[in-house]
Regions:
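His/Asp/Glu-enriched short active-site or ligand-binding loop at hydrolase and phosphoryl-transfer sites
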Residues: 148-162
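Active-site hotspot residues in diverse enzymes, especially metal/ion-binding acidic/histidine motifs
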Residues: 203
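Residue-level signal for inorganic ion chemistry
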Residues: 1, 22, 34, 68, ...
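Divalent metal-binding pocket/active-site signature
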Residues: 8-18, 45-48, 55-147, 167-168, ...
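Residue-level marker for buried hydrophobic side chains located in beta-strands
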Residues: 65, 177-179
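Divalent metal-dependent hydrolysis catalytic cores, especially in the metallo-beta-lactamase
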Residues: 1-41, 64-67, 102, 150
Length: 226
């Protein structure tokens, strides 16, 4: 991994099954860190025991965030599903606040509800976070940026039809953009459709640098310092 210029990786949980996989990777590789949480698609499967396990794992030295948490209404159209997702989103944000960890948020077709909940928690005091694979408008981005949050940018920024995301990248401060993979999904051009990995990050960094009118070396250096 070091040969690709990648020095550190955060492996992000999305399900209970991913908890121990992340722990094993953290223990095996010194450059792998973890984020622990449950994706909104599995919110209806969560119990108090699940939340207790998230809290327990958050105490590990190399567990650096709570995530991937949030709201996803793309497949979940019913109001009762939305209510369950919001309840578990809040429960995991509570853990992030109490354990003094940043969060990593997934939001799909749920822009307003996600923004309202995040704004509520940020006003109450949080330790920052990332809006993972940001896909909403520049106006929504502005609200998150004002709260001091980061926008996660992945392979989609290299796609020709990603006009909205490219406008957001041009608008957002470089200091609030974070490189992401969403592995194994969202491989950037020229590897679109193939399995993604952190080795594809240079393509994402290059696309962002071109949109910003700077060199890729300058961008990645600043991001690493941040």
């Amino acid at each position: 991994m070091y040969d690709g210029g990648i020095e550190k990786i955060v492996n992000v949980c999305a399900s209970v099954g991913g908890f121990q996989d992340t722990v094993k990777l953290m223990e095996k590789y010194p450059f792998v860190y973890g984020a622990v949480g449950i994706h909104p698609d599995d919110a209806d499967k969560m119990t108090q025991e699940t939340l207790d396990e998230i809290r327990r794992l958050s105490h590990m030295d190399k567990m650096v965030a709570i995530g991937e948490i949030g709201l996803d209404y793309y497949w979940h159209k019913e109001e009762d599903e939305h209510q369950i997702q919001k309840k578990m989103f809040r429960a995991q944000l509570d853990i992030a606040r109490e354990e003094k960890l940043p969060f990593m948020i997934h939001s799909r077709e749920a822009a307003e509800d996600t923004l309202n909940i995040v704004r509520e928690y940020m006003q109450g005091g949080m330790y920052g976070g990332i809006i993972h694979c940001f896909s909403y408008s520049r106006e929504i981005a502005a609200e998150y940026l004002k709260m001091g949050l980061y926008l996660g940018i992945g392979g989609v920024v290299t796609f020709k039809n990603a006009k909205k995301l490219k406008e957001t990248v041009q608008y957002a401060p470089l200091s609030q953009l974070v490189l992401e993979t969403d592995c194994p999904y969202m491989s950037p051009e020229p590897n679109r459709g193939k399995r993604n990995s952190s080795l594809n990050l240079p393509y994402v960094a290059q696309a962002i640098a071109e949109l910003k009118g700077i060199t890729c070396l300058l961008y990645t250096s600043d991001a690493a310092d941040e």
